[in-house]
Structures are given as structure tokens and as C-alpha cells.
Amino acid sequence: SIIIEDDYDSELRYFGKPVPALQSLDSTDSVVYLGSFSSTLFPAIKISYMVLPPAIIGIFDQIRGRYTQTCSKAEQLTLALFMEKGFYNTGIKKLRNLYSQKLQASLLALSRYGHGKVKAVDTQSGINLILRIRSSKNAEELCSIAKSIGVHMVPVADISDQETSALIFYYNSIPLKEIDGIVKALMSLWELAPQT
């Protein structure tokens, strides 16, 4: 059997020791490792990669002709040069620092203005947070309110329940200096502030 590993946002881990990729621990050549540059460069580049175990490369070579490669050769060569010159690693370090600051600002603001009704889940990495919110409004309503002030959120029905609505909060797209004010406004619009 084969295991497909999508190491989503592994480059953007902010705290603690990074968890090694399953593929790096694989001694049986049964893990196919997938990755993308969408979070670390920009989504429009649409360059992804796949690391195959040696035993599977031959099979892949036989069927490769059935698939159309849609990624620009010029973009691939530019990215290769970018990596070779060390610019990619430098950029990752800068992104990691910026997103870490944005994450901390988001967590602080949610704690300050959420009045115990907002809990952030999985706060160690990435470009977004999953929020669990105790509110009379459902996740779709909360996301619609967020959208009205330009904040991108997505409802997560699978982990919402009768007591909490779950949604993904994309803090990465908010300028660092605006996070506190935006979260404060959002909590007020969501009517999570204590009534006076």
C-alpha cells in the first residue's frame, strides 16, 4: 500500500521543534510526498511537487504521458534559480517571522476581545486559525459579517456543533498593525462583547 502525505504549511511552523515529514521516516518506500509553493510564494504561481519512492518512479514514468503539465516552464526555471541563489530560504524566514507576529497579534486580540467565547485551535503553524465560537449565530452568519468588513473566513461545518460554530480565520491577509482593531470590530459585530 501507498501513503500520500501532503505536508501542508510545514515551512510555516512557528513554535517548537518541527515534526519530521512522514516520508523522511519511511524505510519501506511507501510514502509519496506532496507539496506546493502557494503559501510560501503566492497562490497564482500554481507550482506543486511530488517526491516519489524509487519503486514507484518507473510506474509514474509509464503513465506520465496521460497527464498534461500546465505549469509554465519559465516559472519553473525562475523558481529553480530563486532557490539555487538562496532567495527562497531567505523569503521563508521573513514570512515565518511576519506570520508568527500576525498569529501572536491575532491570538492576543481574540483573547482580549473574545470574552471567553472564542477559542483558537491549532495555533502552531500556518496562515490561518480555526476558531470555535460560542454564539447564537451560525458559522455562515459569522463569516458573512466578517466579509462585510473585508475579513476572509470560511465556515467549517464538520466541527461545528450545537454550542459552537467553527470557522477558518485567515489572519495572513490582514496587515499586522490592523489586526487588533479588526478583531475588536469583529467581536463587536458578532455581539460577543459583554452587554453593559
Where would I find each of the regions flagged by the language model?
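A generic "structured core" feature
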Residues: 2-4, 62, 79, 106-109, ...
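Conserved glycine-rich beta-strand-loop-beta hairpin in the small C-terminal domain of fold type I
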Residues: 97-107, 118-132, 144, 163
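Conserved PLP-binding active-site segment of the aspartate aminotransferase-like
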Residues: 52, 130-135, 153-190
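PLP-dependent aminotransferase class I/II
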Residues: 31-112, 120-121
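Active-site pre-lysine segment of PLP-dependent enzymes
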Residues: 9-40
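Hydrophobic "anchor" residues on beta-strands that sit immediately upstream
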Residues: 1-2, 32
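Short, solvent-exposed loop/turn segments at secondary-structure junctions
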Residues: 9-10, 38-40, 54-57, 125-128, ...
